[in-house]
Amino acid sequence: MKAIHFGAGNIGRGFIGALLSKANYEVVFVDVNAQVIDRLNEQRSYTVLTADEDNEENVIHNVRGLNSRTQMEQVLAEIATADLVTTAVGPSVLPHLAHPIGQGLLQRNGAPIQVIACENAIGASSMLQEYTKASLSEEEWSKVDRVTGFPNATVDRIVPAQDHADPLTVSVEPFYEWVIETKSMKGEPPTIDGVTYVEDLTPYIERKLFTVNTGHAMVAYLGFQKGLMTIKEAISDQTIAEKTRQALAETKGLLVHKYNFSPEAHDEYIEKIFKRYNNPYLSDRVERVGRNPIRKLGYNERLVKPARQLLDLGHQPTALLAGIQAAFAFFVEDDQESMELQEKRQVQGLEQTVVEVTGLPAVHPLVQMIVGNN
């Protein structure tokens, strides 16, 4: 079996590619990074380290790479004979994959295939499906659509900043979760150990977004506000830890209301998340976790979405509000979005910036709360 994976970065190698290799797929990584691709082709393997006290070493075999800048014809040919296509490139890169994926799928012999976007965004595979459809004629899309599933997925594994002699080596936390929705598949689901298949992904997407991502953002933005350097330092601060717990209690109430999750099971999930944040071997910098604040303060994102939905239910998102306000003050010179955010504040003021970034009207109570308490 062969999987084509777009994105040979840390998540691609340390999570998706590693699981696919262990499931007996030959993994063909596609990336623009010539150094990584050349190294993959030289070594045909790489090492994944577990970021904990055991520091377990796993060698991932049966891998190679293609440079999408210089080897696009080969990329299309590989898609034509693949059993699975996956991505981990970042949501903003997905539009650029539509043309090669569409053209590669057109060359196939009619065997069913799944294209799974493993991105930190809701409905990423559906987005990729729309981009791919737009890149093809109606007749071409009809041919592709008959045998190609674009099942949505949610992925969760913290990959800390890396510093290894071998640029292919990657450290990852022990915990991971990869959940794939079955209802939009064509043909049988791929057999991959460690993957959970569900009929409806929405509850699992929001559980992760409103817990893992919300909590991570709270710790990062509140930690930055206090001048702390790492997630470990920030979560060790009693005030920040308590405020983050309060925020996750707020989102827990929302998730239990919307999806009937077991409150006890969700409490266990939250404790697992806190254990991950406290892992000294992950020790990510708050500046890195907090980057791209404009995206992370979006209407359907980790802080604003649960806060506005709680207000709709008549509940006050007090702790979430603290995280949102801290995010609007986030500024790191080498992060383009945080620089843009502070520029907007200086030029047009906080209220107009909040309206623009969150997509909420100025009269919305959440906008007034963000502006009023600053």
UniProtKB/Swiss-Prot annotation:
EC number(s) recorded for this UniProt protein: 1.1.1.17
GO MF term list: mannitol-1-phosphate 5-dehydrogenase activity
One Gene Ontology cellular component: cytosol
GO biological process: mannitol catabolic process
First-level EC class: oxidoreductase
Keyword annotations: NAD, Oxidoreductase
Reaction it catalyzes: D-mannitol 1-phosphate + NAD(+) = beta-D-fructose 6-phosphate + NADH + H(+)
Residues reported to bind NAD(+): 3-14
Family: Belongs to the mannitol dehydrogenase family.
Protein name: Mannitol-1-phosphate 5-dehydrogenase
Source species: Halalkalibacterium halodurans (strain ATCC BAA-125 / DSM 18197 / FERM 7344 / JCM 9153 / C-125) (Bacillus halodurans)
Lineage start: Bacteria, Bacillati, Bacillota, Bacilli, Bacillales
Gene name of the record: mtlD
